[in-house]
């Protein structure tokens, strides 16, 4: 007796059922994500390239240091010279939108995992599946439910990039020193006060590492998301591959690398307190304060 069961047919039935019965919910999700993604993209694209270069260079100087600021200035000027500034802003908008949504969804989920072993046991296999699934697979449901364009590209990117945000939020809260928690409880903190005044502040370094990893994974989805109309630098790389145009593909890839390095260093500085002008000014301010003078004296 042959068992006739097709996983593919089952998947088709589920997808068709969702499309037939949950179209209003899908439209609401698409409208919300489209509002965020298109709003961020319109804002970034509207900034003149010279102003954008100045802003990112000053931010690099403020958070990282003057050497990296010089690199950022030259690298961004090169991207502008290649005529890829607008495409880079579209890619940055996709990354920021996906990261924002991943943070909004990932931090509460990580908190729930840290507070409940049952939730952690349910969510952890899902995160494992999300991280081991090939990135191309996410394009299929995104395109089927939401069509082509920025919205399905953002959704696929969020699904691919969110697991580190959840895991590192959970890890950061669990690694808060028990003495801090005991001190908070001794002073009469409610569970919510303990979370927001003790656990989250002490887990911030781990949470920012999660943000950094989410941004990097979002950038790694740029070319893949362009296959369903996300646009940006990924579209230039994809066009270069399709036409066997090595130069166009190399330019698009180089611009992605520039954006990745700048975002990586800046977000790392946010988690570690920075090493640039911001940190030096903070140290000078601390040294000039009465407490600093008395300690030094």
Where do the protein language model's features map onto the residues?
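Membrane-spanning helices that line or support transport/gating and their immediate boundary helices
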Residues: 87-91, 111, 121-125, 168-175, ...
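Transmembrane alpha-helical segments of polytopic membrane transport and secretion proteins
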Residues: 1, 265-297
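Generic hydrophobic transmembrane alpha-helix motif, especially the helices
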Residues: 94-97, 102-105, 111-114, 127-161
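Transmembrane-helix boundary motif in ABC transporter permease subunits
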Residues: 58-63, 76-86, 98-127
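Transmembrane alpha-helices
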Residues: 155, 159, 191-225, 247, ...
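Glycine-rich helix-loop "coupling/hinge" segments at transmembrane-helix boundaries
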Residues: 144, 173, 218-259, 275-280
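Interfacial loop/helix-cap signal at membrane boundaries in integral membrane proteins
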Residues: 1-48
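Short cytoplasmic-facing helical segments at TM-TM junctions of multi-pass membrane proteins
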Residues: 165-213, 237
